[in-house]
Amino acid sequence: MTVRPSALDPAIASRLRRNDAGLFPAIAQQHDTGEVLMLGWMDDEALHRTLTTGRATYWSRSRGEYWVKGDTSGHQQWVRSVALDCDGDAVLVRVDQIGPACHTGTRNCFVADPLPTRVGDPGVTADAGPAR
């Protein structure tokens, strides 16, 4: 596993579960509406920068460098809160998104390619028909 040097609080770092590249997913969510905006990747240092600067910072897997959301596009993410999930293998970054979150220009990264989905019904089970 690749773990780059970081100033992240060791108490936080010890709770993180990372992949073999030393990364974990970071879900960006609009703080006031709950809209899921995007998924990025962080390592310990990206999380440290996010927690201490108030700007969402990610690790670019393709470029191999840190990037602060909005530094190039102007579509900034101002951090409102960060939460670690129950397994320690993902973080939820609640932000105030300025402009589109997606590099394609859409508000979020999940609008371009909806998949065909059978919609579930909590009152119906797959095998037995309607629940009683």
Swiss-Prot record:
Q: Which residues bind Mg(2+)?
A: 85, 87, 89
Keywords recorded for this protein, A-Z: Amino-acid biosynthesis, Cytoplasm, Histidine biosynthesis, Hydrolase, Magnesium, Metal-binding, Zinc
Query: Where located?
Result: Cytoplasm
- EC no. given is 3.5.4.19
Output the Gene3D superfamilies linked to this UniProt entry.
Phosphoribosyl-AMP cyclohydrolase
Q: What is this protein called?
A: Phosphoribosyl-AMP cyclohydrolase
Q: Which organism is it from?
A: Frankia alni (strain DSM 45986 / CECT 9034 / ACN14a)
According to the record's subunit comment, the protein's assembly and interactions are:
Homodimer.
Q: Which cofactor does it need?
A: Mg(2+); Zn(2+)
Give the family per the record: Belongs to the PRA-CH family.
Cofactor, free-text remark = Binds 1 Mg(2+) ion per subunit.
CC annotations in GO: cytoplasm
Biological role: Catalyzes the hydrolysis of the adenine ring of phosphoribosyl-AMP.
What is its EC class?
A: hydrolase
Metabolic or biological pathway, per its Swiss-Prot or TrEMBL entry: Amino-acid biosynthesis; L-histidine biosynthesis; L-histidine from 5-phospho-alpha-D-ribose 1-diphosphate: step 3/9
